[in-house]
């Protein structure tokens, strides 16, 4: 298959290296699309795989088109060609691409257009010189609609596109063969063996042909439908009257005894072919497949066979048939008036005695309404069945109507409780508009009961469904308007439930944005708290169910609500973090899928919560200036010496020495601080270009020399002050010397003690460092 997201455009070799064309002769569906419709192309391929094989579907991106692909990939051989019309297709529609599309889409019977993000296909047909195609679908249809259209095209037979299936060389050599007898033989040999039309009755008396019914396998979409009768020496065409979408009826033509071919033409194209027989009256009476009295009823064997065939077809093809209002039909007024003699298929079954078909139809949606319909003469199902002598079928209708009229309310209450419990505990809560599908599922599950009880139970279910369908259309439309965006309001799709969707996909892809709605999309909010949406949706659905609940069930529902409230209170006590899901934070989208689990279970959902970031303080206090490490070391040493002195000498330290040690260290620190500030100022001036490097070095040298001179003067003044203070108290000095001599007999110890106290005053400031060596012109921080 063709890779949908190809890396290069217009690269023919890359396309064929991956196997663009499907293998073999399987050429059923050709999908043409642009880049913005790529997801829809993949989505349609998954749908069409229910009808044809995957290898028979070709995805062809138009941004990589080439004229050589027409012959190499044999696009003409595909039975169905589907073009996705999108905004990108109209924007990139060059003359070459227009010519390319005209060659592919020139046929009318097997081309389908899909409107993807477009309101109309008029702009597309204005750019291309091709007739408008009669097959047009939109993204709003359901998958069954797509499959129905594709099946009709694939089942048309080769006659609709024979002109493109014949090779070009053969057509050039034998131009008259394509429209002559040889073409007719090819059509006859290629005509499908499975009949697509059934004409009843199969044998028609020559004297009184009566009326015939034409049952089509698929609905024909066209303006003109004609029936052609062909015998050995006679040909006749007539237009039938429409009974419903797939059934037509007309008066049988007069033909002699023998076989007659019946061709169904739609807009001049043969859609189906079958064969009937004309016979004499005596032979028709003896035949078990023919009506003995055409005006009254069929023979018993023919009725049973027809009943079994129709019932099996309905159960297999349309098991969930739904009766609709007669006013909803879009038939012409003339045909509607003519066909109201038998308004529904149920009335038709009552007339001809089709018991099995009637039992199946009574189980379908809307059977109660259809059973109460009356024909134009005022007769209902009971009168029709009685008039034609079908007493057994009349009893079935009587039981059905009586059970629906006086049915037991307990079953309906049980059903309502099931719906309420489903809406309360289901992880995927459907909208009120989709509860009609829920009723269908409930009814389908009941079909699996035992055969003797099947008809009675399904009649009661139909009665309950009919009573619940009594809501006004306005209320239903208002409920549906609240659920426009299905992808927002259905956060979890229950794929394990009793879903009757025949396809494996969950939802169609999103549509590409329209050019005119870009501004409006920006105005709409794009972010919604999924937890809040789920709670609001469940609350609205619960209110809708409460309106439909009968007074008898309100007491039970109130008790259930009290139990649920008690459970919620327990959950709130056990789960202190449960409120975090409803807040507008970054965990709303993560925890939305687990909101129902939080409600149904008692465990806190905090175990599945990702770790929260460490909270940061709103106000960080400024860091206090700490004492330099070197100063702390000297302070600890001084304190240790002081404690040792108190221990050994038992005399207090001299206060002058403590006071004299203080200015020594801060002076060095202040010197470094002021030196750094001076260096910073000089660096800024050099960067700004106000001063050169040499000038900055010279100025820093002068400043350093000046600072050294000031320090020397200060040290000298401090020394003089100390000498003056010590000289005024000679007796303290003598006592101190005596004490030191007694406790320190060793002269070295006394000498060291004197050196300890005298070192701060005798030490000189360290020599000036080489500024140019370390920083160029900056001072080194560590001495």
Swiss-Prot record:
Residues 444-479, 549-565, 641-660 have a biased composition (Basic and acidic residues). GO terms for biological process: B cell activation; MAPK cascade; negative regulation of B cell activation; negative regulation of interleukin-6 production; negative regulation of phosphatidylinositol 3-kinase/protein kinase B signal transduction; negative regulation of translational initiation; phosphatidylinositol 3-kinase/protein kinase B signal transduction; positive regulation of MAPK cascade. GO terms for molecular function: phospholipase binding; protease binding; protein tyrosine kinase binding; signaling adaptor activity; signaling receptor binding. The modification Phosphotyrosine is found at residue 649. Specifically expressed in spleen. Highly expressed in immature B-cells and recirculating B-cells, and at low levels in pro-B and pre-B cells. Keywords: ANK repeat, B-cell activation, Phosphoprotein, Repeat. Coiled coil: none annotated. Residues 422-521, 538-586, 604-624, 641-670 are annotated as: Disordered. Residues 1-154 are annotated as: Interaction with ITPR2. Involved in B-cell receptor (BCR)-induced Ca(2+) mobilization from intracellular stores. Promotes Lyn-mediated phosphorylation of IP3 receptors 1 and 2. This is B-cell scaffold protein with ankyrin repeats. It comes from Mus musculus.
């Amino acid at each position: 298959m063709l890779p949908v997201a190809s890396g290069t455009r217009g690269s023919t070799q890359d396309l064929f290296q991956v196997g663009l064309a499907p293998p073999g002769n399987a050429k059923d569906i050709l999908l043409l699309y642009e880049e913005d419709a790529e997801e829809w192309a993949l989505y349609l391929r998954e749908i069409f795989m229910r009808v044809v094989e995957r290898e028979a579907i070709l995805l062809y991106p138009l941004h990589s088109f080439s004229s050589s692909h027409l012959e190499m990939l044999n696009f003409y051989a595909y039975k169905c060609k589907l073009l996705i019309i999108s905004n990108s297709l109209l924007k990139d529609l060059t003359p070459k691409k227009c010519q390319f599309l005209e060659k592919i889409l020139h046929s009318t019977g097997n081309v389908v257009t899909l409107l993807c993000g477009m309101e109309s296909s008029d702009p597309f047909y204005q750019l291309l010189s091709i007739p408008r195609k009669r097959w047009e679908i939109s993204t709003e249809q359901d998958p069954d609609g797509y499959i129905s259209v594709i099946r009709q095209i694939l089942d048309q037979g080769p006659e609709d596109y024979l002109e493109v299936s014949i090779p070009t060389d053969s057509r050039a050599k034998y131009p008259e063969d394509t429209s002559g007898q040889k073409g007719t033989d090819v059509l006859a040999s290629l005509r499908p063996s499975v009949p697509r039309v059934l004409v009843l009755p199969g044998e028609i008396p020559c004297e009184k042909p009566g009326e015939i019914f034409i049952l089509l396998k698929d609905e024909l979409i066209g303006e003109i439908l004609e029936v052609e009768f062909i015998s050995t020496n006679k040909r006749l065409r007539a237009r039938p009257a429409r009974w419903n979408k797939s059934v037509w009826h007309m008066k049988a033509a007069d033909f002699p005894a023998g076989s007659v071919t019946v061709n169904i033409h739609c807009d001049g194209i043969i859609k189906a072919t079958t064969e009937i027989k004309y016979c004499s009256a005596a032979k028709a009476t003896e035949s078990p497949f023919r009506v003995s009295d055409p005006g009254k009823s069929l023979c018993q064997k023919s009725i049973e066979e027809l009943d079994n065939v129709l019932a099996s077809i309905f159960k297999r093809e349309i098991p969930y048939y739904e009766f609709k209002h007669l006013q909803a039909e879009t038939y012409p007024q003339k045909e509607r008036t003519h066909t109201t003699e038998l308004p529904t298929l149920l009335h038709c079954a009552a007339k001809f005695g089709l018991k099995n078909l009637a039992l199946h139809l009574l189980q379908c949606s809307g059977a109660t309404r259809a059973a109460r319909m009356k024909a134009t003469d005022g007769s209902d199902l009971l009168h029709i069945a009685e008039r034609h002598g079908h007493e057994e079928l009349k009893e079935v209708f009587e039981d059905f109507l009586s059970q629906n009229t006086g049915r037991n309310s307990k079953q309906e209450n049980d059903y309502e409780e099931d719906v309420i419990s489903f809406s309360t505990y289901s992880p995927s809560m459907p909208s009120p508009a989709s509860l009609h599908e829920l009723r269908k599922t409930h009814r389908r599950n009941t079909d699996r009961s035992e055969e003797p009880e099947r008809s009675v139970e399904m009649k009661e279910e139909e009665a309950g469904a009919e009573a619940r369908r009594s809501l006004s259309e306005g209320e239903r439309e208002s409920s549906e308007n609240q659920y426009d965006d299905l992808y927002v309001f259905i956060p979890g799709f229950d794929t394990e439930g009793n879903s009757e969707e025949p396809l494996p996909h969950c939802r169609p892809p999103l549509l590409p944005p329209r050019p005119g709605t870009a501004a409006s999309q920006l105005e709409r909010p794009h972010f919604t708290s999924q937890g809040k949406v789920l709670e609001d949706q469940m609350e609205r659905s619960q209110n809708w169910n409460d309106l439909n609940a009968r007074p008898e069930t309100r007491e039970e529902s109130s008790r259930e609500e009290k139990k649920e409230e008690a459970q919620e209170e327990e959950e709130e006590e056990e789960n202190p973090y449960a409120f975090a899901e409803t807040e507008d934070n970054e965990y709303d989208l993560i925890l939305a899928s687990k909101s129902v689990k939080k409600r149904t279970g008692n465990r806190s959902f905090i175990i599945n919560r990702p770790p929260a970031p460490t909270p940061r303080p709103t106000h960080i206090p400024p860091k206090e200036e700490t004492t330099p490490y070197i100063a702390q070391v000297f302070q600890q040493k001084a304190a240790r010496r002081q404690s040792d002195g108190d221990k050994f000498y038992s005399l207090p330290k001299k206060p002058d020495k403590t006071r004299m040690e203080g200015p020594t260290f801060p002076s060095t620190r202040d010197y470094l601080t002021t030196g750094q500030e001076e260096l910073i100022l000089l660096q800024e001036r050099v960067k700004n270009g106000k001063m050169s490097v040499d000038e900055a070095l010279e100025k820093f040298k002068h400043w350093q020399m000046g600072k050294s001179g000031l320090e020397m003067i200060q040290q000298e003044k401090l020394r003089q002050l100390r000498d003056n203070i010590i000289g005024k108290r000679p007796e303290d000095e003598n006592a101190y010397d005596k004490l030191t001599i007694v406790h320190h007999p060793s002269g070295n110890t006394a000498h060291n003690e004197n050196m300890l106290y005298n070192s701060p005053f005798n030490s000189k400031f360290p020599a000036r460092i080489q500024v140019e060596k370390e920083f160029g012109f900056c001072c080194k921080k560590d001495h």
